[in-house]
Design a protein with these regions (language model features):
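Glutamate identity and glutamate-enriched acidic tracts
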Residues: 11-14, 21, 70, 76-77
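Charged helix-capping and loop-helix junction motifs
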Residues: 14-21, 47-51
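Canonical P-loop GTPase G-domain recognition
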Residues: 38-85
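Conserved catalytic network of the ASCE P-loop NTPase/AAA+ motor domain
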Residues: 22-26, 58
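Conserved Switch II/interswitch segment of TRAFAC-class P-loop GTPases
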Residues: 1-17, 27-32, 37-44
Length: 85
């Protein structure tokens, strides 16, 4: 499992997209950690997650976890994903 870190406030960059395509090409399970979730507010998180999913053309087997190091939002989900390794 690979953890790909993106900024939830922005669309994934070309490099983010390229890295995700590389991981999918080699069938590597991936979790997207969308950081800085505290900067946009909880009500906007689903909208930003949808943008990331669409831009990356996210596989149904992969997951996006909104995360904030400031508020610890999403920390349990990240720990759970690490535990699954």
């Amino acid at each position: 499992m690979i953890f790909l870190i993106v900024d939830i406030r922005h669309e994934p960059s070309e490099d983010d997209c390229l890295m995700y395509e590389y991981l999918k090409h080699y069938n590597i399970p991936t979790t997207i950690i969308a950081t800085k979730a505290d900067k946009i507010g909880k009500t906007l998180i689903p909208r930003h997650i949808k943008v990331i999913k669409n831009k990356l053309n996210l596989s149904v087997n992969d997951k996006i976890v909104p995360f904030s190091s400031e508020t610890k939002y999403g920390l349990e989900e990240v720990f759970f994903r690490f535990y699954l390794l």
